[in-house]
């Protein structure tokens, strides 16, 4: 099985910073760099994907101590979108790579970003599918955030403090007092927020996070602090549409607690009401937690300590996306034996193994890099030290609701 390296589409917005370039190794000709779309088949920011020529790992990829070395890389260096082929075109030619769960969608359902908010983003809301399809001819947007870094005192806005009428909200916008209606949430690295369509929200200044979202770029901007772009123009607001789609009810205490979490749990323990994946662990110092799930994505967060080893299954049901949040490691993917016939003509599967007869790929991975494993029967493993985000599709819809 070939491992695909994703080269992100880079977005330059007025609120962006330099951390994605300086700390996460994202290559971009423009600064400030606000967003890196590290898994995207969207027309507004199509990532690119490249594969190794021989699906082999260079000699000397691991030292005698078992730690990863950059000598084992077989991809082109750099993360510019000039590398590889269009991810959207790749999926068009290989629709099976998404997996059987993806057949429910007319498009690749998931989009993943790294976001560096040096300045605050606008306060905004996203419509659901029903409204977006009827009014915009495109899909809505549900998303989740995983906070990676924050400056001292950094916060975000997330839902309303109490129930408000449309008139009260409209008046607050006109009087430039809209932020006072919202829940102001102080953040710490590791916090997770699940944001259903219709929830008013905004990333505050000094926050760097990963965003996993529905494959949509539809945003209704409600409030932008009166600021202007490089040409001296204020950015367009979408107040009327926003008022139609926003959930004006109070964000309940239950919901705030459920959507803001920290910590890590050993594999096998329950996390956020769902059991961990149940995949096998060969060594200690491995932690896995389910941090979010809906029909468009399921997300697990994996912690490896002291060069630990983790192994999981690959299936024909879903692709697997791996985003390195911190640290480094060696990623391996293998396919199973092919089906063979018994000499007497009856079909028979050989015992499932992962020997040299199957295709095997291996590569060194590090902070800020994104990888795509196509849907196929097999297994994958990761050995190293760090934090990793695993995204895939699952059959069960686990969106939390009040």
Residue spans for each PLM region:
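Transition-metal
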Residues: 1-164, 224-264, 268, 299, ...
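Intrinsically disordered, low-complexity terminal tails and inter-domain linkers enriched
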Residues: 52-82, 260-285, 334-362
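Ligand-binding loop in jelly-roll beta-barrel domains
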Residues: 107, 115-120, 139, 150-153, ...
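Glycine- and acidic-residue-biased ligand/ion/polar-headgroup-sensing regions
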Residues: 117-119, 142-143, 147-165, 169, ...
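Loop-centered beta-sheet repeat module
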Residues: 174-220
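Short acidic-glycine-tyrosine-enriched beta hairpin
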Residues: 182-193, 360-377
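Basic, glycine-rich polyanion-binding accessory segments appended to enzymes
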Residues: 256-263, 281-328
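Active-site pocket scaffolds in enzymes
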Residues: 322, 333, 364-367, 371-375, ...
